[in-house]
Every structure is written in C-alpha cells, then in structure tokens.
Amino acid sequence: QKLFHDGELAHCYVLHPPGGMVSGDSLQSRFKVNPGAKVLITTPASGKLYQARQNQIPQIASTHIDVTSDGFCAHLPQDTIVFDGAFGELETFVNVDSRALFFGWEHLIFGRRAGGHPFENGQLIQSLRVSREGRLLFRENLRLIPQTVNAVSGLNGMVSFASLTVVLPQNSGTTSDVV
C-alpha cells in the first residue's frame, strides 16, 4: 500500500499479532512523531484478547506516543474485541509538545454476543495518560468486568464503547483554527 494516502499524512499500519493475544503475550509499541511530521497510526484489523489460561496471566498491550514540535498524530486503531475469559491490560501513554496536535481513540467490544459468546468472565484494565511536555494533563484508569458491562451504572448491557482524546496546540485559539 501507499505510505502517503492524503498529501503529507503518512500512514503507519501496526501489524499486531494477526491471530490476537493470549495469556502471557506482551506487545509494546513506541512511536515518535518528528518535528513537523504528520502521521496516522492505525491497524489493519480488530485487536483480539482471547480467553486467558486458568492462572489468569494477562495479555498486555502498551503504546507510547511522543508528538514533537509542530507534529500531528492521529492514533486511530481498529476496535479491540475482549473475548469471554480474557484478562487484558491496555496501556496508552501520550506526550505532546506544546505546539503539536494529537487525536486518538480507543474502541472496545466485550464478547461476541451475536455469536452466542457474551462476556461473562474476565476483565480488562485500560489506562490512558496524556501529558504535555511531561506534565500530566489527563489520566484515566478503568477496570471493566462483566458486572461493569451489565450494570446500569456501567455500560447497562451495551457491549461496545469508545473514547476520544484530542490535544490541541497550547496557543491554538479556537478549535476551528486547528481543524
């Protein structure tokens, strides 16, 4: 495939384990967006966290992104399917220069309800940390278990949810200046 699909925006496809992650797997990805560079980081397909072994050794995916001066990074991976019995940990660490822009999402699907395989056992620990020049701006830690997915105060039985994070350059004025 072409490296540049849209002008100067480079596309980076992370070829994670195509069959998914099992107990004991650990995937660490590090990205540095150089000054003035523009990149879309994505995956060619859904990530998958399969049922853990009986000893519940987790599957861990850790992503570190550093966006330097005047850089732009869109981190838009495909969804992650958390299979019944999975014990996954997803960590995302983002550091953005004061003159850089970051746009990212995470989309999770719990179980395969349509196939008769709901998420009834296991857990997912998801953490997101966003910093500007090393100073923490946002921190989120979630522990999602079947009870959380089903609780009215949780996902109320919905099996899919996503979060979006946008970090604008520090002195960008208004959103329309950037968009």
State where each predicted segment sits.
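Acidic (Asp/Glu-rich), glycine- and aromatic
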Residues: 83-91, 96-122
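Short beta-strand/loop motifs in extracellular/secreted proteins, especially
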Residues: 37, 100, 126
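Solvent-exposed residues in well-ordered beta-strands and their adjoining turns
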Residues: 32-34, 68, 95-97, 131, ...
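One face of beta-strands
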Residues: 27, 61-63, 69-71, 88-90, ...
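A structural signal for small-residue-enriched, beta-sheet-centric alpha/beta enzyme cores
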Residues: 108-179
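N-terminal, charged/glycine-rich beta-strand/loop interface patches
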Residues: 1-79, 84, 91
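Cationic, beta-structured binding surfaces that engage anionic biopolymers and membranes
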Residues: 61-64, 76-82, 89-91, 107-110, ...
